[in-house]
Protein backbone atom coordinates (compact mmCIF):
# COMPACT_ATOMS: atom_id res chain seq x y z
CA UNK A 1 0.00 0.00 0.00
CA UNK A 2 1.30 3.41 0.89
CA UNK A 3 -0.09 5.62 -1.87
CA UNK A 4 -0.36 9.25 -0.79
CA UNK A 5 -0.27 12.56 -2.57
CA UNK A 6 2.01 15.50 -1.75
CA UNK A 7 2.83 18.83 -3.37
CA UNK A 8 6.02 18.77 -5.43
CA UNK A 9 7.46 21.68 -3.49
CA UNK A 10 6.95 20.06 -0.08
CA UNK A 11 10.26 19.17 1.15
CA UNK A 12 2.41 -7.91 10.51
CA UNK A 13 -0.67 -7.20 11.43
CA UNK A 14 -4.21 -8.00 10.28
CA UNK A 15 -5.73 -4.68 9.38
CA UNK A 16 -9.15 -4.83 10.95
CA UNK A 17 -10.01 -8.07 9.18
CA UNK A 18 -10.56 -6.11 5.97
CA UNK A 19 -12.02 -8.26 3.25
CA UNK A 20 -11.83 -7.04 -0.33
CA UNK A 21 -12.75 -8.57 -3.63
CA UNK A 22 -10.20 -9.07 -6.40
CA UNK A 23 -11.59 -5.91 -7.96
CA UNK A 24 -10.62 -3.89 -4.90
CA UNK A 25 -6.87 -4.40 -4.99
CA UNK A 26 -4.75 -1.32 -4.48
CA UNK A 27 -2.88 -0.41 -7.70
CA UNK A 28 0.43 -0.35 -5.85
CA UNK A 29 0.02 -4.00 -4.90
CA UNK A 30 2.28 -5.62 -7.46
CA UNK A 31 2.62 -9.15 -8.67
CA UNK A 32 6.20 -10.43 -8.54
CA UNK A 33 7.72 -9.99 -11.97
CA UNK A 34 11.12 -9.72 -13.56
CA UNK A 35 9.88 -6.55 -15.22
CA UNK A 36 9.11 -4.81 -11.92
CA UNK A 37 10.29 -1.20 -11.85
CA UNK A 38 13.32 -0.19 -9.75
CA UNK A 39 12.43 0.78 -6.21
CA UNK A 40 13.35 4.40 -6.86
CA UNK A 41 10.71 4.70 -9.56
CA UNK A 42 6.98 5.21 -9.39
CA UNK A 43 5.32 2.09 -7.96
CA UNK A 44 2.23 2.56 -10.12
CA UNK A 45 3.22 3.50 -13.63
CA UNK A 46 6.23 5.19 -15.18
CA UNK A 47 6.10 7.79 -17.92
CA UNK A 48 9.08 9.27 -19.71
CA UNK A 49 7.83 12.83 -19.40
CA UNK A 50 6.33 12.65 -15.90
CA UNK A 51 7.79 14.52 -12.98
CA UNK A 52 8.23 12.12 -10.09
CA UNK A 53 7.51 13.41 -6.60
CA UNK A 54 10.46 12.28 -4.42
CA UNK A 55 8.26 12.01 -1.32
CA UNK A 56 5.93 9.36 -2.66
CA UNK A 57 7.62 8.20 -5.89
CA UNK A 58 4.45 9.06 -7.82
CA UNK A 59 3.97 11.05 -11.01
CA UNK A 60 1.63 14.01 -10.86
CA UNK A 61 -1.59 12.42 -12.09
CA UNK A 62 -4.32 14.72 -13.32
CA UNK A 63 -7.76 14.67 -11.74
CA UNK A 64 -9.55 15.23 -15.04
CA UNK A 65 -11.97 12.75 -16.55
CA UNK A 66 -10.53 10.28 -19.05
CA UNK A 67 -11.77 10.05 -22.66
CA UNK A 68 -14.38 7.33 -22.85
CA UNK A 69 -14.94 7.29 -19.10
CA UNK A 70 -18.61 6.62 -18.38
CA UNK A 71 -18.91 7.43 -14.67
CA UNK A 72 -18.30 10.74 -12.95
CA UNK A 73 -15.90 9.97 -10.10
CA UNK A 74 -15.24 12.27 -7.12
CA UNK A 75 -12.18 14.49 -7.40
CA UNK A 76 -11.96 15.43 -3.72
CA UNK A 77 -9.03 13.95 -1.84
CA UNK A 78 -9.22 12.70 1.75
CA UNK A 79 -6.80 14.01 4.36
CA UNK A 80 -5.16 11.15 6.26
CA UNK A 81 -4.30 11.07 9.96
CA UNK A 82 -0.61 10.69 9.09
CA UNK A 83 1.59 13.75 9.74
CA UNK A 84 3.92 14.67 6.91
CA UNK A 85 6.55 17.37 7.28
CA UNK A 86 8.54 18.09 10.46
CA UNK A 87 8.35 21.80 9.60
CA UNK A 88 4.58 22.05 9.30
CA UNK A 89 1.29 20.69 10.57
CA UNK A 90 0.35 19.16 7.22
CA UNK A 91 -0.95 15.63 6.74
CA UNK A 92 -0.62 13.23 3.84
CA UNK A 93 -3.47 13.23 1.34
CA UNK A 94 -4.95 10.16 -0.30
CA UNK A 95 -5.70 10.13 -4.04
CA UNK A 96 -9.19 10.97 -5.17
CA UNK A 97 -11.22 8.26 -6.91
CA UNK A 98 -10.61 10.08 -10.20
CA UNK A 99 -6.84 10.06 -9.64
CA UNK A 100 -7.01 6.38 -8.74
CA UNK A 101 -8.97 5.75 -11.94
CA UNK A 102 -6.39 7.64 -14.01
CA UNK A 103 -3.60 5.58 -12.46
CA UNK A 104 -5.42 2.36 -13.27
CA UNK A 105 -5.90 3.50 -16.88
CA UNK A 106 -2.15 4.11 -17.11
CA UNK A 107 -1.53 0.57 -15.89
CA UNK A 108 -3.97 -0.89 -18.38
CA UNK A 109 -6.29 -2.13 -15.64
CA UNK A 110 -9.30 -0.26 -17.02
CA UNK A 111 -10.51 -0.29 -20.59
CA UNK A 112 -9.85 -2.85 -23.26
CA UNK A 113 -8.87 -6.08 -21.53
CA UNK A 114 -8.56 -4.40 -18.13
CA UNK A 115 -10.00 -6.33 -15.21
CA UNK A 116 -11.18 -3.43 -13.01
CA UNK A 117 -14.67 -1.99 -13.45
CA UNK A 118 -15.23 1.75 -13.18
CA UNK A 119 -17.77 1.31 -10.40
CA UNK A 120 -15.16 -0.51 -8.27
CA UNK A 121 -12.77 2.43 -8.07
CA UNK A 122 -14.40 4.23 -5.14
CA UNK A 123 -14.35 1.01 -3.09
CA UNK A 124 -10.68 0.57 -3.98
CA UNK A 125 -9.90 4.01 -2.62
CA UNK A 126 -11.77 3.28 0.62
CA UNK A 127 -9.92 -0.01 1.14
CA UNK A 128 -6.60 1.61 0.27
CA UNK A 129 -7.13 4.42 2.77
CA UNK A 130 -8.33 2.03 5.47
CA UNK A 131 -5.24 -0.14 5.11
CA UNK A 132 -2.84 2.78 5.21
CA UNK A 133 -4.47 4.07 8.38
CA UNK A 134 -4.11 0.61 9.94
CA UNK A 135 -0.45 0.42 8.95
CA UNK A 136 0.19 3.81 10.52
CA UNK A 137 -1.46 2.70 13.77
CA UNK A 138 0.93 -0.24 13.85
CA UNK A 139 3.87 2.14 13.33
CA UNK A 140 2.59 4.25 16.23
CA UNK A 141 2.49 1.14 18.41
CA UNK A 142 6.14 0.42 17.61
CA UNK A 143 7.06 4.07 18.22
CA UNK A 144 5.14 4.38 21.50
CA UNK A 145 8.11 3.81 23.86
CA UNK A 146 10.04 6.57 22.09
CA UNK A 147 7.01 8.86 21.91
CA UNK A 148 6.36 8.42 25.64
CA UNK A 149 9.93 9.49 26.31
CA UNK A 150 10.16 12.45 23.93
CA UNK A 151 6.49 13.55 23.88
CA UNK A 152 6.96 14.19 20.16
CA UNK A 153 4.64 12.48 17.70
CA UNK A 154 6.29 10.65 14.78
CA UNK A 155 5.73 11.67 11.17
CA UNK A 156 5.94 9.92 7.82
CA UNK A 157 8.65 11.55 5.70
CA UNK A 158 8.42 9.45 2.54
CA UNK A 159 7.95 5.91 1.26
CA UNK A 160 8.85 3.69 -1.66
CA UNK A 161 7.37 0.61 -3.26
CA UNK A 162 9.62 -2.43 -3.63
CA UNK A 163 7.55 -5.00 -5.51
CA UNK A 164 9.40 -8.25 -6.03
CA UNK A 165 12.14 -7.37 -3.51
CA UNK A 166 11.81 -9.84 -0.66
CA UNK A 167 12.80 -8.68 2.81
CA UNK A 168 15.11 -10.94 4.86
CA UNK A 169 12.22 -11.77 7.18
CA UNK A 170 9.95 -12.72 4.29
CA UNK A 171 12.66 -15.05 2.96
CA UNK A 172 13.13 -16.58 6.40
CA UNK A 173 9.42 -17.14 6.96
CA UNK A 174 9.13 -18.72 3.52
CA UNK A 175 12.04 -21.06 4.30
CA UNK A 176 10.39 -22.02 7.59
CA UNK A 177 7.23 -22.80 5.64
CA UNK A 178 9.16 -25.12 3.33
CA UNK A 179 10.86 -26.90 6.23
CA UNK A 180 7.91 -26.92 8.64
CA UNK A 181 4.74 -26.63 6.52
CA UNK A 182 2.47 -27.57 9.41
CA UNK A 183 3.66 -24.61 11.50
CA UNK A 184 4.51 -21.86 8.98
CA UNK A 185 2.99 -20.59 5.76
CA UNK A 186 4.98 -20.89 2.54
CA UNK A 187 3.25 -17.88 1.05
CA UNK A 188 5.44 -15.01 -0.09
CA UNK A 189 4.30 -11.39 0.28
CA UNK A 190 2.68 -10.01 -2.84
CA UNK A 191 3.99 -6.51 -2.19
CA UNK A 192 6.46 -4.62 -0.05
CA UNK A 193 6.83 -0.99 0.93
CA UNK A 194 9.47 0.83 2.94
CA UNK A 195 8.32 3.80 4.99
CA UNK A 196 10.76 6.41 6.31
CA UNK A 197 9.38 7.56 9.66
CA UNK A 198 10.62 10.61 11.55
CA UNK A 199 11.11 9.79 15.22
CA UNK A 200 11.08 12.83 17.48
CA UNK A 201 13.90 13.36 19.96
CA UNK A 202 14.12 16.07 22.59
CA UNK A 203 17.51 16.73 24.18
CA UNK A 204 16.14 19.35 26.58
CA UNK A 205 12.64 20.26 27.68
CA UNK A 206 12.85 23.85 26.47
CA UNK A 207 14.49 23.06 23.13
CA UNK A 208 12.63 22.27 19.90
CA UNK A 209 12.65 18.59 18.98
CA UNK A 210 14.89 17.04 16.39
CA UNK A 211 13.90 14.12 14.18
CA UNK A 212 15.68 10.89 13.38
CA UNK A 213 14.88 8.87 10.26
CA UNK A 214 13.74 5.30 10.97
CA UNK A 215 13.02 2.86 8.17
CA UNK A 216 10.03 0.54 8.45
CA UNK A 217 9.37 -2.50 6.25
CA UNK A 218 5.79 -3.43 5.33
CA UNK A 219 5.15 -6.86 3.79
CA UNK A 220 1.67 -7.49 2.38
CA UNK A 221 0.30 -11.05 2.52
CA UNK A 222 -2.88 -12.63 1.28
CA UNK A 223 -5.05 -14.19 3.97
CA UNK A 224 -7.68 -16.93 3.94
CA UNK A 225 -11.10 -16.18 2.51
CA UNK A 226 -13.65 -14.91 4.98
CA UNK A 227 -17.01 -16.52 5.67
CA UNK A 228 -18.45 -14.88 2.55
CA UNK A 229 -15.71 -16.27 0.32
CA UNK A 230 -13.99 -12.91 -0.05
CA UNK A 231 -10.18 -12.78 0.09
CA UNK A 232 -8.48 -11.00 2.98
CA UNK A 233 -4.91 -9.93 3.62
CA UNK A 234 -2.66 -8.76 6.44
CA UNK A 235 0.40 -6.55 6.68
CA UNK A 236 3.60 -7.34 8.60
CA UNK A 237 4.87 -3.96 9.85
CA UNK A 238 8.18 -3.63 11.71
CA UNK A 239 11.29 -1.42 11.88
CA UNK A 240 14.07 -2.54 9.55
CA UNK A 241 17.07 -4.31 11.07
CA UNK A 242 19.47 -1.61 9.95
CA UNK A 243 20.34 -0.06 13.32
CA UNK A 244 21.00 -1.12 16.90
CA UNK A 245 17.95 0.82 18.11
CA UNK A 246 15.67 -1.02 15.70
CA UNK A 247 17.16 -4.38 16.65
CA UNK A 248 16.59 -3.54 20.31
CA UNK A 249 12.96 -2.55 19.65
CA UNK A 250 12.27 -5.78 17.81
CA UNK A 251 13.92 -7.93 20.44
CA UNK A 252 12.00 -6.14 23.19
CA UNK A 253 8.69 -6.82 21.46
CA UNK A 254 9.68 -10.43 20.81
CA UNK A 255 10.47 -10.98 24.49
CA UNK A 256 7.25 -9.23 25.55
CA UNK A 257 5.25 -11.57 23.33
CA UNK A 258 7.12 -14.59 24.63
CA UNK A 259 6.01 -13.61 28.12
CA UNK A 260 2.49 -12.32 27.48
CA UNK A 261 1.63 -14.18 24.27
CA UNK A 262 1.65 -12.97 20.66
CA UNK A 263 -0.74 -10.19 19.71
CA UNK A 264 -0.48 -10.73 15.97
CA UNK A 265 0.07 -13.46 13.42
CA UNK A 266 3.82 -13.75 13.96
CA UNK A 267 6.04 -13.51 17.01
CA UNK A 268 9.44 -13.62 15.31
CA UNK A 269 11.58 -10.50 15.85
Swiss-Prot record:
Main location: mitochondrion
Compartments (UniProt record): Mitochondrion inner membrane; Mitochondrion intermembrane space
Alphabetized UniProt keyword annotations: Heme, Iron, Lyase, Membrane, Metal-binding, Mitochondrion, Mitochondrion inner membrane, Repeat
Record-level Gene Ontology MF annotations: holocytochrome-c synthase activity; metal ion binding
Xref: InterPro entries: Holocyt_c/c1_synthase
A GO-annotated cellular component: mitochondrion
Sequence segments annotated as region (Disordered): 1-72
Transmembrane segment boundaries: none
HRM repeats: 25-30, 41-46
Broad class of enzyme this protein falls into: lyase
Keyword Lyase in record: yes
Name of one Pfam family that matches: Cyto_heme_lyase
Catalysed reaction equations from the record: holo-[cytochrome c] = apo-[cytochrome c] + heme b
E.C. numbers: 4.4.1.17
Membership in a protein family: Belongs to the cytochrome c-type heme lyase family.
Additional record remark: Present with 3870 molecules/cell in log phase SD medium.
Function: Lyase that catalyzes the covalent linking of the heme group to the cytochrome C apoprotein to produce the mature functional cytochrome.
Protein name stated in the entry: Holocytochrome-c synthase
Organism, as annotated: Saccharomyces cerevisiae (strain ATCC 204508 / S288c)
Amino acid sequence: MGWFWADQKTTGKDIGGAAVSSMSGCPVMHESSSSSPPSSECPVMQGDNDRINPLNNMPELAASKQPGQKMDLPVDRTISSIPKSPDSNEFWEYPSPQQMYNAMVRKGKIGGSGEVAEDAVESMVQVHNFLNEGCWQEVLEWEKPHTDESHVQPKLLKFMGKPGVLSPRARWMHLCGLLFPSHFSQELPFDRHDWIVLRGERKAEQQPPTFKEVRYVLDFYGGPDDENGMPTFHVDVRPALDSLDNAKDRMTRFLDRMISGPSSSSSAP
